[in-house]
């Protein structure tokens, strides 16, 4: 089993558990150049809030979009957008990635700005 297949099987396992519980989840996806975050409803059918380093306002704030600082900016933006929509509590879906680096920075920035995991 290669790295990508192992990550996908880990993510599938956690998503099944989160869907059974019916919690709204903060889903993270990363590429070498960008970080994406979405808040998805409990049934998994609709995206309620989204933010990424592809957006112009995020690109203006950071020099490079594939690092820890830009992931923290995305975490801050996603938390603020959740507040506007009235979402205060989510389950963190790290998509099979290790809780380290950009994933950790995004999660901690979202927590600091009022989002509860």
Curated annotation (Swiss-Prot):
The keyword Cell membrane does not apply. GO terms for biological process: translation. InterPro entries: Ribosomal_uL18_bac-type, Ribosomal_uL18_bac/euk. The keyword Ion transport does not apply. One of its GO terms (molecular function) is 5S rRNA binding. It comes from the Bacteria. Belongs to the universal ribosomal protein uL18 family. Part of the 50S ribosomal subunit; part of the 5S rRNA/L5/L18/L25 subcomplex. Contacts the 5S and 23S rRNAs. HAMAP family: Ribosomal_uL18_B. This is one of the proteins that bind and probably mediate the attachment of the 5S RNA into the large ribosomal subunit, where it forms part of the central protuberance. This is Large ribosomal subunit protein uL18. It comes from Francisella tularensis subsp. novicida (strain U112).
């Amino acid at each position: 089993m290669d790295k990508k297949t192992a990550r996908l099987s880990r993510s599938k396992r956690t998503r099944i558990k989160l869907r059974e519980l019916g919690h709204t989840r903060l889903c993270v996806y990363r590429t070498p150049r960008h970080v994406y975050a979405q808040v998805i409803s409990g049934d998994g059918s609709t995206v309620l809030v989204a933010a990424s380093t592809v957006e112009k306002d995020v690109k203006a704030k950071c020099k490079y979009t594939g690092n820890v600082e830009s992931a923290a900016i995305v975490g801050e933006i996603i938390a603020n957008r959740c507040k506007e929509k009235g979402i205060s509590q989510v389950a963190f879906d790290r998509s099979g990635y290790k809780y380290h680096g950009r994933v950790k920075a995004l999660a901690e920035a979202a927590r600091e700005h009022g989002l509860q995991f």
